[in-house]
Amino acid sequence: MAMTAAVKDELSRVDVPKPCCRRAEMAALLRFAGGLHIVSGRVVVEAELDTGAVARRLRREIAEVYGYPSEIHVLASGGLRKGSHFIVRVVKDGEFLARQTGLLDVRGRPVRGLPPHVVAANVCCAVSAWRGAFMAHGSLTEPGRSSAMEITCPGPESALALVGAARRIGIAAKNREVRGVDRVVVKDGDAIAALLTRIGAHASVLAWEERRVRREVRATANRLANFDDANLRRSARAAVAAAARVTRALEILADDAPHHLTSAGRLRLEHRQASLEELGALADPPLTKDAIAGRIRRLLALADKRARDLGIPDTEAAVTPDMLVV
């Protein structure tokens, strides 16, 4: 099950004992998923949802909290609609429900944001409003570079109200308009986990955190692998360049090089991928890595001096550009 569907399914089973919180959740759910229609002179309340469990929860809450009957209609997938959608519709008592849930104000005018009893309510109601908004039009992307918890809002007023509710919970959320659609977004991974926990998606937050940790471990492993590859490439280039310089040094000096320097140079050529420490251990008698490095350095310096005196290419000339590409 996708992350968003899993969260909505879990939230549809959250037990909310406080009446004020149940009203706040329903107000947000109807505001973010619903609409008001005039049918034959009557106000009809509708909410379109993409999860059957959420639709059943809304229908049950409308009956238990307000005592109004409602209908559920199923819209089969097709066209631009992915998957079935569920319409919860209140016809007979639509206007009463709209007034009681804050979709209409006392003068019968549509409320654009969230109703006052939610906006100015306690923190518990702010949490419930977020739960309702997410069940209505929320989405949760996989943990990663662009992970986000997002609510699609019916307008800028409801987006600002939801940002304010998040602030009361202690969560940083931002509203933005994308292609003419208002959205509220939580981007920080820790904030997403905290908000999921607050609204009651405990199993989902564990799954989300597990995927988040797994992705971070994988990213760290990839960075280390890239780092190791880069080090190997640098080491390979250095080994090729060192071998070319030593070969040129032995050509320049021929039999005039001191034996201990020549031996160090030949050891380098015989074991091109060995580290200085390994090279020193292979010497007879064994040498420290500083000692073997010093001998090779003196061999190259001696050869370069001879080359300058003779006016011929030195050891650096033996390192061609193609040797540095590995």
From Swiss-Prot:
GO molecular function: DNA binding
Residue ranges flagged as DNA-binding region: 275-308
InterPro entries: Homing_endonucl, Sporu_reg_WhiA_N_dom, Sporulation_regulator_WhiA, Sporulation_regulator_WhiA_C, WhiA_LAGLIDADG_dom
Keywords: Cell cycle, Cell division, DNA-binding
Disulfide bonds: none
GO BP: any one term: regulation of sporulation
Similarity field: Belongs to the WhiA family.
Name this polypeptide is given: Probable cell division protein WhiA
Originating organism: Salinispora tropica (strain ATCC BAA-916 / DSM 44818 / JCM 13857 / NBRC 105044 / CNB-440)
